[in-house]
């Protein structure tokens, strides 16, 4: 029996139903690196997964980076579920609605390769994975399968998926995506964090890491002066204002329509919204793995429909 594994291939992080790790990948060629944490051995080469982040590339299929990160994600998810390292997998992945039709065939072929099973080693454990199927679903909308009640309670709502590089917007009317309203803003968390880092450097001379800035933005523990925290919070509010303004300019009236915010940036916006923004209603899905869970449920639903037909 095959296992369904949902994978959200973000610019900032790779997410499965139970795991999330940075989307960075460092190649060490044929030389084994100093660490086993995140260590992937594939095709006679060594890679460390989860260090830093991917350079922005519009087409994720231009090199093998996201394929290698997919193998790491499968290994992590299998281990988390307590499953054997030799198994068959059905991948449920996603793409933004703005590029869904164009990129879907190529992304499926990229993940579903002819050489099966795929043999590799991750963190010292040997895996033999047969990828039987790759199904691709719209990001954001698939995540709403984890909160079905949201679609039943409102005739219209705005879906805002705040990812690493883009914020993908789409209106949903009577539980059906209004595909002609799909819009993408290049205002994701990478842009937010980079702008804050630069502002902190200008005002204090300090160079903070992504991890430090992310924790401060999320209100999580992180050693740092009050001056730095003030800058981070001020810039977090500035980012939120910019995002709301850009969304309104894209034709979505946030004073009139409820908005569902999800993705890695949703927690930042949730902490920096103000009553003076006058938004109609905001609903936050703060688990950054919600898209991956939604992909799994979508594929399971499709499979049930086929078996019942």
Q: Language-model features: where?
A:
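Conserved blade-register residue in beta-propeller folds
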Residues: 16, 169-171
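A contiguous pocket-lining binding segment that forms or flanks enzyme active sites
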Residues: 199
């Amino acid at each position: 029996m095959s296992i369904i594994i949902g994978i959200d291939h973000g610019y900032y992080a790779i997410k499965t139903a139970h795991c999330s790790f940075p989307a960075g990948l460092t190649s060490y060629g044929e030389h084994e690196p100093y660490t086993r944490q995140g260590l992937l051995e594939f095709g006679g080469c060594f890679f460390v997964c989860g260090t830093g982040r991917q350079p922005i590339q519009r087409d994720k299929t231009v090199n093998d980076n996201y394929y290698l990160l997919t193998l790491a994600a499968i290994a992590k998810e299998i281990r988390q579920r307590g499953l054997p390292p030799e198994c068959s997998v059905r991948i449920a992945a996603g793409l933004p609605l703005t590029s869904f039709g164009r990129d879907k065939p190529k992304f499926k072929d990229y993940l579903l390769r002819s050489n099966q099973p795929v043999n590799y080693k991750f963190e010292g454990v040997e895996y033999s994975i047969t990828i039987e199927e790759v199904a691709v679903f719209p990001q954001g909308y698939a995540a709403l399968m984890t909160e079905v009640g949201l679609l039943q309670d409102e005739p219209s709502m705005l879906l805002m998926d705040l990812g690493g590089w883009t914020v993908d917007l789409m209106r949903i009317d009577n539980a059906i995506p209004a595909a002609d309203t799909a819009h993408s803003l290049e205002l994701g968390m990478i842009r937010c964090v980079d702008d804050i880092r630069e502002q902190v450097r200008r005002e204090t001379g300090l160079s903070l890491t992504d991890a430090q800035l992310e924790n401060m933005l999320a209100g999580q523990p992180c050693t740092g002066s009050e001056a730095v925290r003030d800058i981070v919070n001020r810039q977090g509010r500035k980012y939120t204002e910019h995002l709301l303004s850009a969304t309104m300019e894209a034709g979505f009236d946030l004073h009139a329509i409820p908005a569902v915010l999800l993705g890695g940036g949703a927690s930042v916006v949730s902490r920096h919204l103000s009553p003076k923004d006058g938004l109609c209603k905001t609903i936050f899905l703060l688990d950054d793995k919600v898209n991956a869970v939604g992909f799994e449920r979508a594929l399971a639903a499709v499979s049930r429909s086929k078996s019942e037909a």
